[in-house]
Design a protein with these regions (language model features):
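Nucleic-acid endonuclease domains
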Residues: 2-109, 113-202
């Protein structure tokens, strides 16, 4: 088989249907999900390089950097940790399907937030829905200077007490039906939270 033919047939993630897991003694089912594997890391590394090169060209032409793609956050997390990417699909047995990933071994619903930084671009804000339901909050910091993705595990309840201004917390704005926005990376640094995993792009 020629090299270009092999490239065209390169394996790219698995789409799984009706994946079952148990959460709080309740059987739940993900109607359709994406499961990446270590074999997908080659493609993800290539995608990262293309995205980084695009941003460098954007800046050269004085354009804004492209947003961090979900493939480089949720897709990478799925490949590294074996979590199923829900891709906003329905999950029977759960009152909410607002999570991004599911650990089908433990039954954890995972919300993943991410940001990317460069030497001249600080971390930007992310938002939480007013009715977000999840068990574990994961934050990924993609450092485009070091070419690393650092994963942090945050308390899924403590984040609601983060102050957004002098009088309101995330929980306060969620109770008002609003979508609070917060820059997470400085709060991680201030709390001296260490990453549980650091991935280096090749």
């Amino acid at each position: 088989m020629r090299a270009n033919e092999a490239s065209k047939k390169e394996k790219i993630m698995n789409t799984i249907k009706n994946a079952k897991f148990t959460r709080n003694d309740t059987l739940c089912t993900i109607s359709t999900g994406d499961l990446f594997s270590k074999e997908d890391l080659t493609g993800l590394n290539r995608y990262y390089k293309s995205w980084k090169a695009l941003n460098e060209e954007n800046l050269r032409f004085k354009m804004r950097r492209a947003n961090l793609p979900e493939l480089l956050s949720e897709g990478l997390a799925s490949a590294l940790f074996g979590w199923v990417r829900t891709n906003a699909t329905s999950i029977s047995g759960c009152s909410s399907s607002s999570c991004d990933l599911v650990n089908t071994e433990t039954g954890e619903l995972i919300q993943l937030k991410a940001c990317s930084t460069t030497a001249n671009t600080p971390a930007g804000p992310t938002s939480f829905g007013p009715r977000s339901e999840f068990d574990t909050l994961i934050f990924m910091h993609l450092d485009c200077e070091a070419n690393t993705a650092s994963f942090y595990k945050l308390d899924a309840n403590v984040y609601k007490d983060w102050m957004l201004n002098r009088i309101e917390t995330i929980a306060d704005q969620q109770a008002q039906g609003r979508r609070p926005r917060v820059t997470i990376l400085p709060k991680i640094k201030a709390s001296n939270i260490q990453p549980f995993y650091v991935y280096s792009f090749e």
